[in-house]
Regions:
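Acidic, divalent-metal-binding catalytic cores of TOPRIM
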Residues: 1-225
Length: 225
């Protein structure tokens, strides 16, 4: 969407997602509590998805601007593949991704991103990023919503991992607080396989700019405007 590929519009019978891909829509932050609740049948009180994705986006924003700059100037110098490596976050049994709302993983990402930004700033001191920021701001890109515009498959994989970890944390908390019995927890763990299905149902119509634009195009295509 941001690179404005030709003929991807309603006039050419192609619906624009107004994100990188439709998978980004499934990762909309405001719907992820519901995803985890449908999987576990519990209320999410252990993780703030909105804050996590806002922080994640803010960390990536300046580096993403550099990436967009090079997509127009010379893609080889900062390729899609190289940028996509920054979408993944560390997750281990010793340091679960969701601990402290992802703070440890986000701090590690921030350090990696800052190193790359400093390197690019030194190597290309005359790059005019202000023009790039303004150009893409007009298309809807802001520091808190970068996750809509990065590669959807990578983002979806990340959010799937986060949701799985959140569901496990919800179940552990419920068991610890004796909200559920052991048998109920076992049954809920068996149901965790439904997470991918539930994540793909995460569409919040009318809730944010890209989906509203897509809905508008569908109405136009159907002649309802």
């Amino acid at each position: 969407y941001l690179l404005r590929e030709r003929k991807i519009d309603i006039k050419h019978f192609v619906l624009q997602t107004y994100t990188y891909s439709f998978e980004n829509h499934h990762c909309f932050a405001d719907g992820l509590d519901d995803v985890c609740s449908r999987v576990t049948h519990l209320k999410n009180t252990v993780f703030d998805f909105r804050r996590f994705l806002s922080d994640f986006s803010a960390i990536l924003y300046d580096l993403f601007i550099w990436h967009l700059y090079f997509q127009n100037a010379d893609p080889v110098l900062f390729s899609q593949f190289e940028f996509d490596a920054y979408i993944s976050l560390s997750n281990s049994k010793a340091f679960p991704l969701v601990y402290d709302n992802g703070a440890r993983a986000l701090d590690e990402l921030r350090m990696r991103v800052e190193r790359k930004i400093k390197y690019l700033g030194r190597k290309y001191p005359h790059a005019d990023l202000a023009i790039v920021r303004e150009k893409y701001r007009e298309l809807g890109l802001k520091p808190d919503n970068v996750y809509f515009f990065i590669r959807g498959h990578n983002l979806y994989d990340l959010i799937s991992i986060v949701c799985k970890e959140v569901c496990k944390a919800m179940l552990r908390t419920a068991k610890k607080n004796k909200v559920v019995t052991h048998d109920m927890v076992s049954e809920l763990y068996r149901r965790r396989n439904n997470l991918d299905y539930e994540l793909r149902q995460n569409i919040k119509y009318g809730a944010y700019f890209p989906i509203r634009k897509l809905e508008q195009d569908i109405r136009e295509f159907l002649g309802e405007n």
